[in-house]
C-alpha cells in the first residue's frame, strides 16, 4: 500500500441522474426516493438527486425530498449546467433552478474540451472559460458549495491541455470545492487517467474527483487509477448503471478501495450493506442483477468444480479473493455434472441433510445422469434440495398425484400475426390426487396448460394447505435442448416462484413440454409447502 493509503475517498453517487439514463430504466418519483434511502443506508457521502427544472418528475422529486427524505449520512446534491453562452447568471433559468432546489451542494457541468466549446456551444474559448467561472462564482455567492464536473476533460486534455487546465483554474478561482475530471465518452485507459489526474493534482490546490464511464470496459479500473494519482472523490452509480455501457460501478469501487487498497470510503459497518443495496436498487429499477456482477452478484462467490469446493471446505480463501460476508454476500456451492462428492456434501450440510457414505456417491451419479439428460440443477436449487432430501429417506406426504390430463379447444385458424380472424384458446386441466388418504379431483381453466394445471391443483390443495395462496409463479422459461430434432426435441422448463418472502426455482425436462412443466410445477408447490413458516423442516433418517 502507498503511504497515503488511509486517506478518505468521497463516494458520490449519481444513480438517480446518470444511472437513470441507461436504456430500459424509467424511475418514478417513488423509485427515486426509495433509492435515495438505500444510498443513505450505505453511507455514501453525496447523493445526486437529478436536474431540477429539467422535467416535472425531477421537480416533484426535489419538492418531496425536502419533506420526505431525512438523510443520516449523505449530503443531497442538485445537478445542472453553467449559464448559457453570452448570457447573464442572474437571468439564467438553470442556475435559478439550482438555487431553488435548496440543496447545500450543487454540481454543475461545463465544457473542458476546446472542440466542444467551438462546435457544440459555437462560442469562443474565452467565453467558454467565462461561462464556468461566472456560474460558479454566482452560486458560491448565493451560499452554495459547488462541485464542477469538467465534461470531456480527458479527451480535451489530450487535444489541448492548456485550455483544459485553464478551465479548471478558472473554476478553482471562482470557488469550486471539487474539480471532477470526467471521461464522458468512456474511452480513456487507466494509464492515461492516472497521468492526467496526477498532472491536475500537482498543478492545482483543490480537491480533485473522477467521473468515469465504461465504454472501454475500464470504468472501475479508471476509478482506481484516478485515486492512486491523488483523486479524493469518485463519482459513479450502483451496479454501474448509466447511458450506453454504463458508469463505473460504485459497489466494486468501494470494495476494491476499502478491502484491497486500505482507503476509507463508506463507514466500515456499512460494508455489509453493499450486496443488499446492489440487489435492492436492481429491484427498484426493475432490472435483473447480473449474476456475475463483481462482489454482489449471486455467482460472485459460487463454486461449481469439485476441486474448488473441496479446497474451500478446508480453506475458504483458497478460491475466494475476499470474505464474501464482509460485503453482505456469501459462498454458494453449485451442483452440476462438474461437481464431486465434496461439493454435494457441502451443499447437503448447508441444508441440514445427511448424505454420508454410499448414499452420497449414489446421488452424485444420479445428478450426473440427469444433467446428461438435460437437467440443470445449478439454476434450480429447489428441485436439487428435494432430490437430496428424497435420497436421505424423506418422502413428501402433502399429496399424491394419480393422473392428470389437459384439453385444449382452439377456435379460429392460422397465425395471429397475419390472420384477421380472432383466435381463442381455452384450456382445461383435470387432476386426480390423494390428500390425507382421500381421493379428490381438481378442475382448472387457464390461458394455457401450466396455468390450467396450477389452477386445478390449487382447487383441491388450498383447502388443506391455505399457505398455497401466498405462493405464485413469477417466471416461466422454456428452452429446446436439441434443436435438430425439431418438434420432437427435449424441452427444459424452469419455474420461478415466490411466497412474498423467498424466491425459488424448479426444473422439469421432457420431450413433452406439458410433462416438463408439470415436473417443475409439482416441485415448486412441494418446495413451497416444505418451507412454509408454519411447518418444521424434516430431519434426515
What does each model-found stretch correspond to?
Residues 5-9, 15, 255, 261-436, ...:
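A mid-to-C-terminal "edge-of-domain" accessory segment
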Residues 181, 236-243, 258-267, 327-333, ...:
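Short beta-alpha connecting loops at secondary-structure transitions
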Residues 185-188, 195-314:
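Catalytic alpha/beta core domains of metabolic enzymes, predominantly
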Residues 343, 445-463, 512-528:
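Stable alpha-helical structural segments in soluble proteins, enriched in small hydrophobic residues
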Residues 464-498:
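Generic long, charged, amphipathic alpha-helical segments
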Residues 500-538:
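Mixed-charge, glycine-accented linear interaction segment located at domain edges/termini
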